[in-house]
Amino acid sequence: MSETPLRVSLSVNDRVLLHLLENDHQADHFIVTSAITRPGIAESCGLHPPNVSRAIRPILKQGFVSEHTRQIRGETRRQKTWQLTPLGREEIKNRLPSIKETNILIR
């Protein structure tokens, strides 16, 4: 009996890029939801908030994401947010077929 091995999870970069793709409708908006802030990305991607910046740094250097300071809906202070660049959109869309075929173990 041959079973396809399950991966425990996707890479952090893939999780972050997928999350930003899901929230791409907020790109270039002045007021956004907390989904594209450090706490929002951390919650969605299963990361600790301090690790979000560390996870984003390499994909920021590769030009897949851009960093902005924006007003968050329902909050008084502005926060750092991230969004996909055109290169990042192309990259994650190219990765989608292999991600969709990946069996992932959900705990």
Language model features by range: what are they?
Residues 60-71:
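A short, conserved structural fragment
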Residues 9-10, 29-34, 49, 53:
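Alpha-helix N-cap/helix-initiation sites
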Residues 10-13, 70-94:
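Short, cationic-aromatic polyanion-contact patches
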Residues 46-62, 76-79:
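Short amphipathic alpha-helical interaction segments
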Residues 2-4, 8, 87-107:
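Amphipathic alpha-helical dimerization/coiled-coil segments
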